[in-house]
C-alpha cells in the first residue's frame, strides 16, 4: 500500500511539473540541473559555484524592421524568420540552496554569461561577440521516493540571461557598425532518479522538458551614398522541447560534493559542472 502511494505521488509530481511548464508564458540558455532530488535537510544551506557551456540552434520568428535614411524614417516591414546556428553560451554562477521543508529544496543562482555565434544573419562570415553580462536563475527540487540506494524526484528551474555585443566580419571592406541584444528566459522541468553507486559516487538522470522565450534586437548602420540605419527585432518562442540528462555526483569530503552533467535535446548540447558545500 505504501509503495502504491509513493508511485502515485511520483506521477502527480510529474503531471504537476508538466502542467506548470505548459502554462508558463515567459519561458534559452540551458542551465545545469544537478540531481533531480532534494539534497538538503530542512533548515540546511548550501553554497558553491556552477559552470555551464551550451551549444544550440536558436529560431528567430515574427521579425519586424524599421529603416531610417539620413536620420529620417524611411519605411517598415516584416522580416523573414531565421535560425541562429551554433549559438554558444558560457555561464558562471554563484549558487545558494536552502532546505525549506523535509524533502523540498529551493535554490537561487546569480552570475555572468557570454555568448557567440557566427555566419547566421547575412552569411558573410559575420560574428557576434560580447563581454560578460548579467545572468540569474532560481528553482525547486523535491524528493518523492527514497528506498535502498535509490531516490526519485523532480526539478523545476528558470534562468534569465541578457547578452549585448557587436557583430563584425572580416569580409566587410567598409566598417558597418552592427549591434545585437539577446534576452532569453528558459525553463526546465525534469523528473528523474539518483542512484548511490559507491559510498562516494552517485549517478543521476532522467527526461526533461525545455521552454524558451525572449527577444533578439539588431541594429545596423550601412555606410553608402546614403546613411541607412536599420532596427530589426525578432521573437524567440519555443517549447516544449524534450531531452534527457545524465550526471555523476562525487563526495569530495564531508558536506562537500561536485557534480558533472550532460544534457541533450534535438537542437542543443549542454555540459555542466559545480562544486557545493552544505552547512
Which residues does each PLM region occupy?
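Transmembrane beta-barrel strands of outer-membrane/channel proteins
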Residues: 47-53, 108-112, 154-160, 205-211, ...
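Repeated loop/turn-to-beta-strand initiation elements of outer-membrane beta-barrel proteins
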Residues: 103-106, 147-152, 200-203, 250-260
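Solvent-exposed loop/turn segments connecting transmembrane beta-strands
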Residues: 86, 238-240, 259-274
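Cleavable N-terminal export/targeting peptides
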Residues: 1-41
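Outer-membrane beta-barrel biogenesis signature
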Residues: 25-69
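Residues on the lipid-exposed face of transmembrane beta-strands in outer-membrane beta-barrel proteins
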Residues: 49, 94-98, 138-142, 158, ...
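Extracellular/periplasm-exposed beta-strand and loop segments of Gram-negative cell-envelope proteins
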Residues: 55-89, 110-135, 158-186, 213-224, ...
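Outer-membrane beta-barrel transmembrane strands
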Residues: 83-109, 116, 182, 194, ...
Amino acid at each position: 500500500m505504501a509503495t502504491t502511494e509513493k508511485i502515485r505521488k511520483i506521477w502527480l509530481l510529474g503531471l504537476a511539473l508538466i502542467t506548470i511548464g505548459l502554462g508558463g508564458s515567459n519561458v534559452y540558455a540551458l542551465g545545469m540541473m544537478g540531481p533531480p532530488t532534494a539534497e538538503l535537510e530542512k533548515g540546511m544551506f548550501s553554497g558553491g559555484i556552477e559552470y555551464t557551456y551550451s551549444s544550440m540552434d536558436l529560431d528567430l520568428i515574427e521579425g519586424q524592421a524599421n529603416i531610417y535614411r539620413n536620420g529620417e524614417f524611411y519605411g517598415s516591414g516584416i522580416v523573414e524568420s531565421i535560425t541562429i546556428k551554433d549559438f554558444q553560451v558560457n555561464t558562471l554562477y554563484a549558487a545558494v540552496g536552502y532546505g525549506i521543508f523535509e524533502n523540498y529544496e529551493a535554490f537561487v543562482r546569480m552570475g555572468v554569461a557570454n555568448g557567440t555565434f557566427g555566419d547566421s544573419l547575412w552569411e558573410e562570415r559575420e560574428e557576434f561577440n560580447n563581454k560578460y553580462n548579467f545572468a540569474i536563475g532560481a528553482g525547486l527540487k523535491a524528493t518523492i521516493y527514497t528506498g535502498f540506494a535509490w531516490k526519485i524526484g523532480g526539478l523545476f528551474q528558470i534562468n534569465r540571461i541578457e547578452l549585448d555585443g557587436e557583430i563584425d566580419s572580416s569580409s566587410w571592406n567598409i566598417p558597418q557598425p552592427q549591434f545585437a541584444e539577446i534576452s532569453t528566459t528558459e525553463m526546465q522541468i525534469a523528473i528523474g532518479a539518483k542512484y548511490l553507486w559507491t559510498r562516494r559516487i552517485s549517478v543521476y538522470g532522467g527526461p526533461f522538458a525545455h521552454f524558451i522565450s525572449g527577444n533578439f534586437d539588431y541594429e545596423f548602420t550601412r555606410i553608402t551614398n546614403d546613411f541607412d540605419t536599420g532596427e530589426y527585432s525578432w521573437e524567440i518562442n519555443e517549447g516544449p522541447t524534450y531531452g534527457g540528462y545524465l550526471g555523476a555526483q562525487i563526495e569530495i569530503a564531508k558536506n562537500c560534493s561536485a557534480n558533472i552533467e550532460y544534457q541533450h535535446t534535438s537542437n542543443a548540447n549542454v555540459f555542466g559542472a559545480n562544486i557545493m558545500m552544505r552547512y
